[in-house]
Amino acid sequence: MNAHNYNYVESVGILEDSKKYTEKEHLVSKKILCKDYNDAVILPPKADYAGKRNGNWGKGGVVDSEGNFIVASTYVGDWATQGGFYEYNHVDKIIDDDVVYIGFISGHYGHFLVDCTTKLWPLVNMKKLGKNVKVAYTGDNELNGNAKMIINLLGINDEDLLYIDEVTKFRKVYVPEQSAKPGEWYTREYLKVFETIQENIKQRAEVHSEIKRKVYFTRTGYLDAKKKEVGEKTLEKVFAYNNFEIYNPERLSIVDMMEIINESTEVACINGTIPLNMIFSYNKNVKLIVLNKTGVYHRNLEYFAEICNFRIIYVDVYDKKFKAKDLGVGPFIVTVTDNLRNYFLDNGMKIPNETKTFKYKDYCTFLILLANRSVRDKLRPVKNKLKEILHK
């Protein structure tokens, strides 16, 4: 039975999709392997313009000493895919080290959490691989920020992280299989990754048991949000009026963010990447209020909620006249809806009398963003075709 609260949600699609998801078993007893290959080569990512457009992160991966591509070095998710052999003239670099290859690391933090954590499971117990084994990865850029800190929280030091941006041969390469496929299945090895991170955060974070906080994590500080989201400042104000502390998560380390969450009774945020961070919290009693910016089901959030056992209260805050058809691209407009008013009323919270549901400036901004997206959508096939021609 679904433990999440949908009393403040109107989308029939969300309700039906959630029901379908909870009817399936996602924890599997699948045996996953981490095989090693002597004198193996790591190929950095190379754009694959012949492949599908969305979610294709290019070719690349691991090739054994005989030139055979190692299929386990690819990634197949529910949306994103990465990996595949391509011809190369020579090896650019030879490093006399043993490494474990954790795959392609996306520069998008949400995709890092969902897609790029599936091959981290050998890092939980590196001793099994042997002494002085380092961690190799490819990706958009070198690891930084909270993505790197999450790897550090598995016991990996910065000096043992090797970013591969050219064809590189190693003494030995360990290649782990995926421990999960987002939204579809996961193994106990995958679960252990997050349990380990939770425990290490618990050891680092300062927790003041006497503090009982209510917090709202806002997206208004994200540059990307400013390009596609309108109206959240109004939501900030109504939550602040009810004694919620307002935080910008992009200014917090993952340890600091969990320190805040772990001593909170209530956490509120817009649906998207922010609530995915709850997978690192050991506070299972927190009331998580997720504000829907559209009527599209976020399967990966419920997938993470299942893995680490947290419950969600969903509240619609989008204008039904302008609801987006996706979770990421938008544009989105959020406001004080009847569903939010009902949630506040049912929970002894108040909305300031002067709060305006309709703001002319917000709607004008939204319509401009909507027009911009329409133009981009029309130009995208031309842009992709041009890229394909230039890279032939």
What are these regions (language model features)?
Residues 1-390:
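The feature primarily captures lumenal catalytic ectodomains
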